[in-house]
């Protein structure tokens, strides 16, 4: 209670009505898999478009050869398909997706690299310094092989030269040092920068030189510098010009199916340029070698045709994430605590995730880990992929090993345009596209609407399904909770199933299971204020009012059955739901019953023959 100690007017705010419960988002997804590059540690990263995914995780992955594909199929892990699934998610209306990158636990992953060396272009041995520039991708993985690193000299200023003649009164002096040059306007010119000597006559090859200061006083009529290296020393004549050059680097990522991304950097010398790249680049890191080697590496005899063109142009190679060593354990991951989890376990760090998938993986251990993850957290739903080449009998056998109301299985796989531009289509797992369908349905209709009878986007028109499922064939799938993807004349290729993998008929529909997850999570988050409040009738009434108001809104949206709220749900929180022992143990128990709407899976129209007399009687 406030204290009133002095006369005056006191304005106070008082609460009226129940605290509102806001519905949680149901369209946010999480995926786990291999990417070309990207952060390996930390929490899953949010991407909101395919362009965002390319920026953070790189482009599409190149499938292995037939032997590599067969080996991957034996493990039930087609590791290269996550980017295709991400594209399918956004093509079908998904908006927010958290990605957790998977890398092998074995230390065979390496970053793409390139080194400028006197005699070869190769990565030096660990700890070696026999290089001038070492360029490495910031993260291991094949994505580094899509990086191009160019360095070129760019003009930063021109300085006319004069030749300082010795005074007439001076005794016989030694001939002037041909490496000494004098500029009439110093401007921004200083020691330590690189310059190019341009002949007034146009004769001779322009070469790079480093300006050095040997401590000599300024020459008459200008500022004196020494050109180094000078072997042979250049002979300076009147009318010659020094062109100061800066070094400009461009890092370009060009991967199949992804828009190019370019970073640019500029500095006065290679060492400063390397620091700029290290400080600002998202793609590469640059290390300079020993100073003596670095000076010698600058092209002192650069051909004139390349003077202001890239003189270091390289494509990084030999990058690999060690995908051939991937195991089911890498996908399941380890629980090292918040921010240190890996694989599927890392999705626990993102509370907003409402649905998740491991695209292109049908390994039993991985799927068990995904189902366990969803069941343990109790607030998310999984979409699973079956084997890519399974027939009807094969997919039924595969499904027989699964039983859960927290996941759904779709068949067959999809055919999508090859991201590399090949004529032949690429095989894509359905999970990414289906999670996008879930997200779009949630936004347009609500989580209570079954994500079915919806056109699949991002697949090849007319032939986008790996198998053509007929009604008779679906009769063999639907009772087992295998959702068919079917093509219909004039209707396109559609999702034609909405069942979970549960053997309990109460939870056999995807929308019913996800509706309850939505209600449970919303109430959970909306009642956090109740904890440690006095556990008495006033609190119970507030809880009842909050839940009732929330469920009334859900009923108005069409998610609950019944013509009145009383028919749609019931909320009890009073002495009938709690005993004295419950109160003594600090328990507040509220019981809620809701009547969900079920999808019209079987539309039955009964037609009979009748006579005119019988219809008018």
Predicted feature residues:
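Small/polar beta-strand repeat architecture
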Residues: 201-293
């Amino acid at each position: 209670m406030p204290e009133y100690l002095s006369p005056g007017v006191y304005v106070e705010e008082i609460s009226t009505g129940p605290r509102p419960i806001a519905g949680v988002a149901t369209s946010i997804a999480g995926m786990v898999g291999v990417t070309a590059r990207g952060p390996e540690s930390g929490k899953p990263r949010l991407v909101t478009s395919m362009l965002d995914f390319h920026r953070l995780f790189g482009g599409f992955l190149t499938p292995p050869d037939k032997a590599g594909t067969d080996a991957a199929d034996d493990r039930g892990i087609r590791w290269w398909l996550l980017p295709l699934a991400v594209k399918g998610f956004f093509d079908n209306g998904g908006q927010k997706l958290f990605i957790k990158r998977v890398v092998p636990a074995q230390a065979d992953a390496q970053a793409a690299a390139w080194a400028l060396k006197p005699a070869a272009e190769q990565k030096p041995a660990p700890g070696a310094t026999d290089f001038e520039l070492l360029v490495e991708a910031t993260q291991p993985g094949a994505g580094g092989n899509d990086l191009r690193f160019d360095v070129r000299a760019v003009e930063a200023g021109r300085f006319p030269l004069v030749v300082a003649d010795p005074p007439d009164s001076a005794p016989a002096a030694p001939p002037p040092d041909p490496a000494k040059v004098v500029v009439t306007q110093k401007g921004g010119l200083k020691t330590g920068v690189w310059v190019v000597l341009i002949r007034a006559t146009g004769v001779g090859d322009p070469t790079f030189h480093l300006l050095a200061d040997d401590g000599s006083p300024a020459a008459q009529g200008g500022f004196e510098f020494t050109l180094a290296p000078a072997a042979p020393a250049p002979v300076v004549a009147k009318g010659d010009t020094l062109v100061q050059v800066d070094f400009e680097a461009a890092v370009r990522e060009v991967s199949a199916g992804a828009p190019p991304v370019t970073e640019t950097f500029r500095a006065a010398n290679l060492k400063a340029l390397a620091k700029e790249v290290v400080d600002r680049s998202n793609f590469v890191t640059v290390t300079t070698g020993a100073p003596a080697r670095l000076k010698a590496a600058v092209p002192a005899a650069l051909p004139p045709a390349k003077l202001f063109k890239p003189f270091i142009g390289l494509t990084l190679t030999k990058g690999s994430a060690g995908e051939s060593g991937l195991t089911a354990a890498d996908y399941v991951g380890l629980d090292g605590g918040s921010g240190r989890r890996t694989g599927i376990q890392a999705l626990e760090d993102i509370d907003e995730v409402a649905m998740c998938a491991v695209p292109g993986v049908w390994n039993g251990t991985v799927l068990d880990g995904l189902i366990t993850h969803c069941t343990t957290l109790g607030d998310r739903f999984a979409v699973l992929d079956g084997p890519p080449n399974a027939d009807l009998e094969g997919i039924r056998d595969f499904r027989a090993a699964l039983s859960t109301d927290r996941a759904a299985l779709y068949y067959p796989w999809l055919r999508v345009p090859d991201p590399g531009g090949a004529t032949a289509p690429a095989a894509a797992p359905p999970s990414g596209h289906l999670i996008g369908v879930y997200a779009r349905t949630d936004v347009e209709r609500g989580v209570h609407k079954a994500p079915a009878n919806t056109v699949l986007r991002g697949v090849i028109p007319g032939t986008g399904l790996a198998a053509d499922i007929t009604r008779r064939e679906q009769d063999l799938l639907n009772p087992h909770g295998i959702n068919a993807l079917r093509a219909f004349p004039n209707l396109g290729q559609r999702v034609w199933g909405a069942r979970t993998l549960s053997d309990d008929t109460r939870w056999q529909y995807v929308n019913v299971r996800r509706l309850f997850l939505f209600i449970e999570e919303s109430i959970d988050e909306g009642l956090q204020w109740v904890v440690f409040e006095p556990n008495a009738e006033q609190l119970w009434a507030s809880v009842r009012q909050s839940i009732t108001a929330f469920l009334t809104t859900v009923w108005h949206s069409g998610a609950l059955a019944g013509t009145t709220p009383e028919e749609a749900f019931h909320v009890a929180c009073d002495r009938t739901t709690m005993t004295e022992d419950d109160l003594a143990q600090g328990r507040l128990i509220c019981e809620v019953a809701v009547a969900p709407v079920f999808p019209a899976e079987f539309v039955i129209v009964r037609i009979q023959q009748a006579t005119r007399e019988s219809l008018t009687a």
